[in-house]
A protein has these predicted regions:
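Terminal accessory/anchoring regions of large secretory-pathway or extracellular enzymes
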Residues: 25, 35-38, 220-230, 237-794
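Alpha-helical scaffold elements lining the catalytic groove of polysaccharide deacetylases
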Residues: 89-107, 171-190, 555
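C-terminal domain-boundary segment and adjacent tail
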Residues: 8, 46-55, 136, 149, ...
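N-terminal catalytic cores of secreted or lumenal carbohydrate-active enzymes
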Residues: 1-100, 107-111, 137-141, 254, ...
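Surface-exposed loop and adjacent secondary-structure segments within mature catalytic domains
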Residues: 67-74, 95, 128-175
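Conserved, mostly hydrophobic/aromatic
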Residues: 9, 104, 135, 234, ...
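CE4/NodB-like, metal-dependent polysaccharide N-deacetylase domain
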Residues: 97-130, 134-137, 185-201
């Protein structure tokens, strides 16, 4: 061993076993103590990352902030990492990881003139392989992590696109106990004599603290009396001494750790995805509107929403390992961001709607914004109100929907969001073909129809079947399950849709497990009597599997299941002319310390895989039933026929030979942390358990090879509203188009100097594409390597 770099830090979780305001107070206290020691000990260096903490100090203690700026110039205080905070790095999308970097970089460059080149994520519970490319493309030359411990040491991390970044997975922990730092430093040195250059972290952490006087003086005395070269140091200085030329190469996601966190606190995860989606969609709408109208993008308001999202991606909020108050605050924060983005989007939409002609008499216009740079064909929903309430008992108002050219499109009426039993509020579902990146126009005309003349559809006693030229979907009325799902003549699902219950414990992290396999039983179909009792109408005689919506567009089947004290309402929505099945589950969860999975049994199985940050993770080398993490989709790739499950905020699951098991929810206690042989939580009282009560889940089963764009549409849905335009202004057609469906337009953003577009090749081979931006008359021809990410600025 030639040299030891001591990196003093104060790991400070903004929220975890304490709420954010406690974290704010501790940040100020910790930074003040660290500044004192930096001023008192000339050789001492304090390192800290996370822009959000510096923002808090700047706002609430500006004098301390000025001291820190002076210490940064002197070199005693080093800005570390440069991100907004340490986010979860497996569930956070590639686009959000870019945002974490840009928010932090913008802040540190503006306030300190510093751009760190070593990224830091000590505490997150794993790292997507897509991050290797993200770091390389954003100017980082190295990365320091702590988990999973099986990767401890230095290595080259090779991304999906073959980009490479040196990584140090630290030995031991990022922190030390007060007065015990030297003891820890000595231990790490003794345990790893093989290391030529060693990185050793110390400082009281988790709830802040950082350096202490006794630790600094003990360490300085040790340095003075030791022949080994030991220095107070920083991340970049450590990597400057490391010879990376012969390091081993790692070509995989850096997982698993805390696999329960892929599922704990589903409401946080769903709200997180919803805000991710809305920011992406709103930014596209705002940029498109700015290019074709007088709209000025409110970048400061948008940044508030982005910071709300970034904060809730923190590695104890998004993973669900915080206390109940942290969950509640996280939901408030995400809702705050969503409210901002909804208003910004609506402003942009109204600008994009300019130039639409006024509606004719008796016509109700429907406007649909397609944010995507390609044509979308989708079943859409819209609600509007009749001009007058219709109080005629046996008569209903029916709409006919036309496209812009006057062609009738398939449509049907469905139950509205309200339960007002009056012909006034109307909900229409219609099949639409949408031009790229533009507002599309549809029109409705109305007529009154006698109730006896409304169409009716008949289904068999044992099965409910929906068939078209490409797909067959059959729901079994005796089981409530998907009996068969066939696309292109190939059977994809068989007896699928069981809701399975597994024994779990109080630990929301799932720290001590890699899978959940202690099977306890299935939810079973309710009897008809029990289903009517649950619905609140015991005197009725409806079936527990029944058609609740039907028409020319789709059939929706509802099935009710039960398990002990819990109930599941499953709705299958099957298009009359599509090739997918939408599944919406309302789960009333009342079992503690359980994992609940949704098992989709396939006909053939295949290679299990799922979306990761700007790429695809393969799980073929995992053990059977290992818990895995994915983003917008997962499924089986198979030459005989693929099958994938799209989601809107579900991140965990497992695979065996033929089953896709989506992890719906877990019910551990809040922040129940395993400690050696102790009980995880006290047994002498009632404890709050996570995800008890009503929860909602949304999935789409597809058999398409172009799964990435399908998942994008399912998450960033075309936006529909009934709106009567003025007829004024200039109508603009498709604003942005992209001619290769394997290349994904991830974002279109406003920057200080123009626009930024993020695209990535979602294929394991080279690709090319043309991006056309019509208002700027700009054609950009692009060549991509496999899984390559491109960030264009103009």
């Amino acid at each position: 061993m030639e040299k030891v770099h001591l990196l003093c830090n104060a790991h400070l979780d903004p929220a975890w076993l304490w709420p954010w305001n406690d974290g704010l107070a501790e940040a100020i206290s910790t930074f003040r103590v660290a500044a004192d020691f930096c001023e008192q000990y000339d050789n001492f260096i304090f390192n800290h990352n996370e822009a959000v903490l510096y923002e808090w100090v700047e706002e609430h203690d500006p004098a301390l902030f000025e001291r820190i700026k002076t210490l940064v110039k002197k070199g005693n205080w080093r800005i570390m990492g440069g991100w907004y905070l340490q986010p979860d790095c497996v569930m956070t999308s590639g686009e959000s990881l870019l945002s974490q970097i840009s928010l932090g970089r913008e802040y540190f460059k503006e306030k300190f003139g510093i751009v760190p080149t070593t990224a830091i994520n000590f505490d997150p519970f794993g790292h997507s392989r897509g991050l290797a490319q993200i770091l390389s493309k954003t100017g980082f030359d190295s990365y320091i992590i702590m988990r999973p411990a099986k990767f401890a040491g230095n290595f080259i991390w090779r991304g999906l696109d073959d980009s490479e970044i040196p990584v140090c997975c630290i030995y031991g922990s990022y922190n030390s106990l007060k007065g015990k730092a030297l003891e820890k430093i000595k231990y790490i040195i003794e345990q790893h004599p093989e290391e030529k250059i060693l990185l050793n972290l110390w400082g009281v952490g988790n709830h802040g603290g950082g350096p202490s006087r006794i630790d600094i003086e003990n360490i300085n005395e040790y340095i003075k009396n030791n022949d080994l070269k030991i220095i107070h140091s920083a991340a970049e200085d450590y990597f400057a001494d490391v010879d990376t030329s012969s390091l081993p190469v790692v070509e995989e996601d850096l997982v698993p750790f805390a696999v329960g966190c892929y599922t704990s606190m589903v409401r946080i995860k769903q709200a997180h995805r919803r805000l991710e989606n809305k920011i992406a969609l709103a930014e596209k709408a705002m940029c498109y509107a700015e290019m074709v109208s007088d709209l000025k993008i409110d970048t400061e308001e948008l940044k508030k929403a982005k910071k709300a999202l970034a904060f809730c991606q923190f590695h104890d909020i998004l993973p669900g390992s915080g206390i109940k108050k942290v969950e509640e605050d996280g939901l408030k924060c995400l809702n705050y961001g969503e409210e901002i983005v909804d208003r910004l989007y609506m402003k942009a939409f109204l600008k994009l709607a300019e130039g639409q002609k006024k509606a004719n008499d008796g016509e109700i216009p429907i406007l649909v914004f397609n944010p995507h740079p390609f044509e979308v064909e989708e079943e859409l929903e819209v609600e509007f109100l009749l001009q007058n309430q219709n109080w005629t008992e046996d008569e209903w108002t029916i709409a006919t929907v036309y496209d812009e050219k006057g062609n009738i499109v398939a449509s049907q009426h469905e139950k509205t969001a309200s339960s007002l039993n009056l012909d006034w509020v109307k909900k229409i579902c219609f099949k639409a073909k949408l031009a790229p990146s533009s507002v599309n126009r549809f029109n409705c005309t109305l007529k009154q129809v006698k109730e006896k003349d409304l169409p009716s559809y008949q289904y068999g006693e044992d099965f409910i079947s929906v068939k078209n030229e490409r797909m067959t979907a059959i729901i079994n009325r005796k089981t409530g399950l998907i009996e068969k799902y066939t696309v292109g003549g190939i059977n994809r699902l068989v007896n699928a849709g069981k809701i399975e219950v597994y024994k779990d414990n109080e630990d929301p992290w799932g720290m001590t497990v890699s899978s959940f396999t202690d099977y306890l039983g299935d939810f079973t179909l309710m009897s008809d009597a029990a289903a009517n009792e649950f619905a609140g109408y015991p005197e009725e005689n409806y079936k527990s599997v029944r058609v609740i919506e039907d028409g020319d567009v789709r059939t929706t089947v509802e099935a009710l299941f039960e398990y002990k004290r819990s109930v599941a309402v499953v709705q299958y929505s099957i298009p009359k002319n599509g090739t997918y099945i939408d599944i919406n589950i309302t789960l009333f969860s009342n079992e503690v310390n359980r994992m609940i999975k949704y098992n989709l049994s396939t006909a053939e199985g295949g290679e299990p895989c799922g979306e990761t940050a700007f790429g695809i993770s393969s799980y073929k080398n995992n053990n059977c039933d290992d818990e895995v993490v994915f983003q917008k989709w997962c499924g089986f790739k198979n030459e005989k026929g693929d099958v994938y499950v799209l989601n809107r905020g579900t991140y965990g699951g497992s695979f065996n030979e033929k089953d896709i098991k989506i992890s719906l929810l877990r019910t551990p206690v809040y922040s129940g942390h395993p400690i050696h042989e102790r009980d995880i939580a006290p047994h002498n009282r009632y404890l709050n358990h996570i995800d008890m009560g009503e929860r909602h889940f949304s999935f789409r089963i597809v058999a398409d090879q172009n799964v990435q764009n399908k998942a994008l549409i399912f998450n960033e849905q075309p936006q529909v509203i009934s709106f009567f335009p003025s007829g004024e202004g200039e109508k603009f057609g498709s604003i942005v188009t992209l001619d290769n469906n394997e290349v994904v337009l991830s974002s279109f953003k406003k920057t200080v100097n123009g626009y930024e577009v993020v695209l990535h090749n979602f294929a394991n081979h080279n690709n090319s594409a043309e991006l056309y931006i019509k208002p700027l008359d700009k054609r950009i021809n692009l060549n991509f390597g496999k899984y390559e990410l491109k960030i264009l600025k103009f």
